[in-house]
């Protein structure tokens, strides 16, 4: 049987513990210190990039202010928070001032060219030096920017449960709301410095604009996919200047898809538009729509005969008579608008939506004057 034998006098017994555990600890400390140094370096780079975006916006005529700002997000994000954020748009027509509760912008350490931001409402719109005339609010508003200030690639803006009120003296008046609104833009061809081609997509879900037009009182879904061709570059500048460039270069706005749904009404359109030297739209979209007979009365019978021409006069007289004597028979006049066809299995009408010096006409029906883009 083995027995314990004490070590001889003057000889130290071997220790069962060692300093081996210190090595991984030191490695962890070095990694943590390196990560901290890297985070602060990345934070400085991110601050420079955010400053670059702000400078680009300033050169585009949009000036931003921030009452209180802070930096955080360690260890995996760089977060920039701005409390009581503001913006001045002196080049807008008319000039306006915006103010929001706060903005939180963030950049991931591993994805420094993607900037994400959330805007906390409400956001007020005012004439310079005047009380707010409109107030916008939402449950969520997000912006994403991909690329760098010198070479932007993509921008997106998304809101949920958005509302826009006009601040009347008595009480706010709702002028727009949407369950969801989206705006996306991206560089499709060319470069930022030479002949860029820009794709723009928008969408509205369950939107309404009671004061815009009687037809816009009821909720509708709307989506567009368009392409801008004719820009010289995408250097910082106001959008009216960009549209002027497109006109001078004989460029165009290619509407690749437009879709509108409201109740039984479904309309799709595509075509190409140009700009006149005065900034008005010029061109034609081919529209195919179902349920047209239900919206004709809302367009205003008095406007139907203003287009001139025998066909327009016949349509105006027919609708005027049918509207008074037999409202249910107004659908028979729809054939005067254009070619009868089908859309998604339903009976539809194909008709041109024309723009001439900004005046929009749907078939022979005059819709109204659109504003100039510059």
Task: Go through the PLM ranges and name each one.
Residues 2-25, 67-68, 243-248, 258-260, ...:
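Extended terminal
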Residues 21-39:
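Hydrophobic membrane-insertion alpha-helices, especially the h-region
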Residues 41-58:
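Alpha-helical transmembrane signal-anchor/signal-peptide segments
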Residues 59-191, 258, 269:
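N-terminal beta-strand/beta-hairpin edge segment
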Residues 69-71, 100-110, 136-150, 173-193, ...:
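Extended lipid/amphipathic-ligand handling interfaces
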Residues 79, 153-156, 196-201, 250-257:
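Short, hydrophobic/aromatic-rich segments at coil-to-beta transitions
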Residues 86-96, 123-134, 161-176, 206-217, ...:
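Flexible, membrane-facing loop/turn or short amphipathic-helix motifs
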Residues 182, 200-204:
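Beta-strand-enriched cores of mature, soluble protein domains
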């Amino acid at each position: 049987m083995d027995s314990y034998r004490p070590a001889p006098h003057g000889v130290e017994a071997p220790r069962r513990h060692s300093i081996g555990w210190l090595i991984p600890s030191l490695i962890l400390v070095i990694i943590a210190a390196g990560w901290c140094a890297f985070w602060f370096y990345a934070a400085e780079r991110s601050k420079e990039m955010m400053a670059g975006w702000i400078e680009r916006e300033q050169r585009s005529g949009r000036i931003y202010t921030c009452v209180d700002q802070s930096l955080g997000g360690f260890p995996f994000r760089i977060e920039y928070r701005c409390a009581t954020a503001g913006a001045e748009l002196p080049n807008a027509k008319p000039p306006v001032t915006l103010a929001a509760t706060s903005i939180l912008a963030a950049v991931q350490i591993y994805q420094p060219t993607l900037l994400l931001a959330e805007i906390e409402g409400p956001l007020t719109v005012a004439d310079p030096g005047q009380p707010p005339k409109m107030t916008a609010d939402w449950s969520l508003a997000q912006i994403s920017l991909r690329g760098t200030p010198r070479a932007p690639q993509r921008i997106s803006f998304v809101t949920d449960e958005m509302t826009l009120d006009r601040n009347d003296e008595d009480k706010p008046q709702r002028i727009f709301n949407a369950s969801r609104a989206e705006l996306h833009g991206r560089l499709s061809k060319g470069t930022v410095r030479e002949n860029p081609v820009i794709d723009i997509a928008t969408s509205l879900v369950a939107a309404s604009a009671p004061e815009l037009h009687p037809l816009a009182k009821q909720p509708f879904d709307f989506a567009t996919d368009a392409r801008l061709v004719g820009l010289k570059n995408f250097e910082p500048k106001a959008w009216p200047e960009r549209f002027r460039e497109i006109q001078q270069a004989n460029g165009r706005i290619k509407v690749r898809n437009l879709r509108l749904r409201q109740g039984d009404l479904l309309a799709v359109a595509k075509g190409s538009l140009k700009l006149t030297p005065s900034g008005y739209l010029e061109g034609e979209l081919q529209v195919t729509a179902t349920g047209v007979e239900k919206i004709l009365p809302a367009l205003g019978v008095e406007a139907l005969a203003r287009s001139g021409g025998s066909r327009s006069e016949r349509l105006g007289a027919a609708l005027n008579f049918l509207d008074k004597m037999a409202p249910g028979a107004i659908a028979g006049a729809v054939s005067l608008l254009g070619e009868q066809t089908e859309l998604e299995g339903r009976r539809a009408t194909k008709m041109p939506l024309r723009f001439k010096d900004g005046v929009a006409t749907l078939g022979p029906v005059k819709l109204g004057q659109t504003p100039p883009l510059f």
